[in-house]
Regions:
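Ligand-binding clefts/hinges and TM-proximal coupling segments of bilobed small-molecule sensing domains
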Residues: 25, 154-169, 208-210, 242-278
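Bilobed "Venus flytrap"/periplasmic-binding protein-like clamshell domains
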Residues: 37, 42-45, 53-69, 123-174, ...
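Extended ligand-binding regions for polar small-molecule ligands
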Residues: 57-70, 130, 138, 144, ...
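Periplasmic-binding protein-like
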Residues: 119-125, 202-242, 261-278
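Alpha-to-beta junction loops
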Residues: 36-37, 72-74, 91-99, 144-146, ...
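A ligand-binding cleft/hinge motif common to bilobed small-molecule-binding domains
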Residues: 84, 100-109, 160-161, 188-219
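Short helix-initiation/N-cap motifs at beta->coil->alpha
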Residues: 75-87, 132-135, 169-184
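Extracytoplasmic small-molecule ligand-binding "clamshell" domains
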Residues: 24-100, 109
């Protein structure tokens, strides 16, 4: 199915929607003929607006295709800062978070997540040659280095939990600002998802990817689509459709351009487990 994915400025997308079978504010919007608003930031590979202004990235692709399998194609992308995604969902500025958000216990208090759609570790970007030998959170802690990461990223909480001082955690809006801080010497390392780190390292000669094999095991996480707690009925239907789609040849062909491979499938891990253990 060919699905248009234009930004808000292009207007509402006219399409048919599924018969009302769920309860909750999202289903109320669907019943009223309104769009399903998907919220995401500008995160390479995961969820971002491409040069044509369309919703792109593998988490957007998965969410949109699952919705389509439910008969729902009236989708309206909403782009914002990463740190505003959960507040925006709760304030009903959009209906789903499709930016590739990790399932964390602290987030599960505010968001109802779908079953996982991907697994990924954290990655570290350093200056070319890695002069400080930084390959893990522990290296940042022991060397009292300055790390830069995104405001609202899981990496902030991870660093704090390990004992890295807040003064050594620089928070910026996103990947572009992280690279700028690293290049300017304001930070010794940039910490973000391994997906993003690999993508950025390939685009900038002045920086490189640290040795991901040295990253702590607890930094491996699972991403899912975020819903409001009030939309549990719709979420159950989404999960049923997701189960039929995840890992299929159709899906893997769709997301291959975003470097998603079988290694990134979540396996048997459930959102319930991730909420309790991450």
């Amino acid at each position: 199915m060919n699905i248009t994915k234009g930004l808000i400025a292009t207007g509402f997308l006219m399409a048919t929607t599924a018969t009302s079978v769920f309860a909750g504010p999202l289903q109320d919007r669907i019943d009223a003929g309104e769009t399903i608003r998907i919220g995401f930031a500008n995160i390479p590979l995961w969820g971002y607006p491409n040069e044509a202004g369309d919703a792109d990235g593998f988490t957007n692709d998965i969410a949109i295709e699952v919705l389509a399998s439910m008969g729902l194609t009236n989708v309206e992308p909403v782009v914002g800062d990463w740190g505003g995604l959960i507040p925006g969902l709760k304030a009903e500025r959009f209906d789903l978070i499709t930016g590739g958000m990790y399932v964390l216990g602290s987030r599960c208090e505010n968001v109802s997540f779908s079953e996982p759609v991907a697994r990924s570790g954290d990655g570290i970007l350093v200056a070319a040659g890695n002069p400080e030998g930084i390959n893990s959170y522990t290296d940042v802690l022991n060397g009292e280095h300055i790390m830069v990461t995104g405001a609202g990223y899981n990496t902030v909480e991870a660093a704090q939990n390990l004992g890295i001082a807040d003064a050594n955690i620089m928070q910026v809006p996103g990947p572009t600002e992280m690279v700028a801080a690293l290049k300017a010497g304001r930070a010794n390392a940039a910490v973000l998802t391994d997906f993003e780190a690999q993508h950025l390292a390939a685009d900038h000669d002045e920086i490189e990817l640290g040795d991901s094999s040295q990253m702590e095991e607890w930094s491996k996480n699972f991403a899912a689509i975020g819903f409001r707690h009030e939309d549990q009925d719709f979420l159950a239907g989404f999960n049923a459709a997701l189960k039929d789609y995840l890992g299929t040849e159709e899906m893997m062909a769709k997301v291959a351009e975003h470097e998603y491979s079988e290694l990134h499938l979540p396996g048997d891990v459930t959102t319930e487990w991730a909420c309790a253990n991450r």
